[in-house]
UniProtKB/Swiss-Prot annotation:
Organism whose genome encodes this protein: Nasturtium officinale
Lineage of source species: Eukaryota, Viridiplantae, Streptophyta, Embryophyta, Tracheophyta
Family matches, as PROSITE patterns: CLP_PROTEASE_HIS
Role of this protein: Cleaves peptides in various proteins in a process that requires ATP hydrolysis. Has a chymotrypsin-like activity. Plays a major role in the degradation of misfolded proteins.
An example Gene Ontology molecular-function term: ATP-dependent peptidase activity
Family, as annotated: Belongs to the peptidase S14 family.
Primary gene name: clpP
Location in the cell: Plastid, Chloroplast stroma
Protein name: ATP-dependent Clp protease proteolytic subunit
GO cellular-component term (any): endopeptidase Clp complex
Length: 196
């Protein structure tokens, strides 16, 4: 039996009465938000608008992005990453469960020293994929060129944010590389593993 989105009590400062709001709205007010699904245009636009709104509201208080995602659309994920770099407050990233593919790219985009993984979290990096098998020959060539540019960008970001040499990152991106929380820390994708 689905329970829907739970409601929780919330009292605004200066108000006497408590109102019931859905749990996500309550957490947003505390600057906490979640990527708990596949990354697509809709979820990336929601995360981007939240980050921008909250940074306008108060630009000195950190934002917290909790991640449990199998990945998704590369360009949508890159838009979330770019926004994290653009907004003034630090964005702390917390991996709980899985940060795979473009979700690991978002994870590594958190403020340096403020990227965390829960002890049993998993992180997976790999090269961006495409739908070559569906394309005509001319489209295939154009798409391959674009995919190479995207791969170079993603590789460059991982190198910059992890401190690993380009050859290590390039080699790791050749296949699906799964890491435990401590392995992700050693790889420079997260800075801390939360203690139990």
């Amino acid at each position: 039996m689905p329970i829907g989105v739970p409601k929780v009590p919330f009292r605004s400062p200066g108000e006497g009465d408590t109102s019931w709001v859905d749990i996500y709205n309550r957490l947003y007010r505390e600057r906490l938000f979640f990527l708990g699904q596949e990354v697509d245009t809709e979820i990336s636009n929601q995360l981007i608008s939240l980050m921008i709104y909250l940074s306008i509201e108060k630009d000195t208080k950190d934002l917290y992005l909790f991640i449990n995602s199998p990945g998704g659309w590369v360009i949508s994920g890159m838009a979330v990453y770019d926004t994290m770099q653009f907004v003034r407050p630090d964005v702390q990233t917390i991996c709980m469960g899985l940060a795979a593919s473009i979700a690991s790219f978002i994870l590594v985009g958190g403020a340096i020293t403020k990227r965390i993984a829960f002890p049993h979290a998993r992180v997976m990096i790999h090269q961006p994929a495409s739908s070559f098998y569906e394309a005509q020959t001319g489209e295939f060539i154009l798409e391959a060129e674009e995919l190479l540019k995207v791969r170079e960008t993603i590789t460059r970001v991982y190198v910059q944010r992890t401190g690993k040499p380009i050859w290590v990152v390039s080699e790791d991106m050749e296949r699906d590389v799964f890491m435990s929380a401590t392995e992700a820390q050693a790889h420079g994708i997260v800075d801390l593993v939360a203690v139990q």
